[in-house]
């Protein structure tokens, strides 16, 4: 064999070894449980909720929340961890099915109860949905936020009605104002995007009424005026009102009242004439 052919053979052998090593490394990375590659280029920012949607290996989109020591990955529909407890979409669905079966057998809710352990499982599940609707709000998927907040409010009602122990009836109630606020914000945001500003204001009004009802129920009406959830909704309502088209007659009426208050009677007379002319013209 010539020296040239020998060198060529050795070079080809080295190339083959290198390709084999690279392929082995690729396979190792693809099967590795190390999440370093998933986090690369996605730094954790303290004080900021970092969320993204990614394509899952199963072909379905996933929701990821960046944490200081890694990430939280959730399904976008169904139970956030992708599990189906007792073959149901969620534990809440499972226990609601149990209730329906109990009613079918006995014709009443009487004697249907949730044990302390069952309530604990429902609370843990509620946290998963909280983490998801918070993430969904960040990426402005407001319809899904309404879905998940409605669901957690339903869970609070369910535990409140059927928990066997008083503490299990009440432990989630402290979160009702926050969930109600997020539900109203998401619903109003959808309506604003559709140009339905009056509907958005009505959604906020209903949310505020529900929060007020919560505090009244526990004899804490003064706390309602100071609660952060109500302040957030009132600020949102103000922003929406600024987007409403201005009624020129209503604006002139406001100017008239201001002129009368300042005793600017000549200005008030002019404003009355303008109002009268516009109303007659209408």
Regions found by a protein language model. Give the residues of each.
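Alpha-helical linker/edge segments of TPR/alpha-solenoid repeat scaffolds
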Residues: 104-107, 177-193, 224-248
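Acidic, Ser/Thr-rich low-complexity linear motifs
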Residues: 116, 161-177, 216-227
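TPR repeat positional signature
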Residues: 129-130, 148, 177, 184, ...
């Amino acid at each position: 064999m010539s020296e040239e052919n020998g060198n060529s053979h050795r070079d080809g052998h080295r190339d083959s070894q290198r390709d084999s090593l690279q392929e082995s490394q690729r396979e190792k990375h693809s099967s590795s449980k190390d999440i370093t590659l998933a986090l690369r280029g996605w730094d954790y920012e303290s004080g900021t909720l970092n969320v993204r949607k990614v394509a899952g290996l199963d072909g379905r989109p996933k929701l990821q929340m960046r944490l200081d020591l890694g990430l939280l990955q959730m399904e976008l529909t169904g139970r956030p961890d992708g599990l189906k407890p007792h073959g149901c979409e969620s534990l809440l669905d499972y226990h609601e099915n149990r209730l329906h079966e109990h009613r079918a057998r006995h014709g009443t809710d009487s004697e249907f109860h949730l044990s302390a352990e069952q309530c604990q499982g429902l609370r843990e599940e509620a946290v998963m949905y909280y983490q998801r609707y918070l993430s969904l709000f960040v990426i402005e998927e407001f319809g899904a936020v309404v879905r998940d907040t409605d669901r957690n409010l339903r869970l609070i009602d369910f535990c409140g009605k059927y928990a066997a122990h008083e503490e299990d009836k009440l432990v989630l109630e402290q979160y009702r104002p926050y969930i109600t606020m997020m539900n109203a914000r998401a619903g109003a945001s959808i309506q604003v995007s559709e140009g339905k500003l009056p509907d958005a204001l009505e959604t906020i009004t209903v949310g505020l009424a529900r929060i007020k009802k919560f505090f009244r129920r526990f004899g804490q009406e003064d706390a309602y005026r100071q609660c952060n959830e109500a302040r957030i909704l009132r600020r949102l309502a103000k922003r929406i009102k600024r987007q409403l088209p201005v009624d020129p007659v209503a604006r002139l009426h406001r100017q008239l009242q201001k002129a009368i208050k300042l005793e600017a009677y000549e200005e008030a007379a002019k404003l009355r004439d303008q109002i009268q002319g516009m109303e007659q013209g209408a």
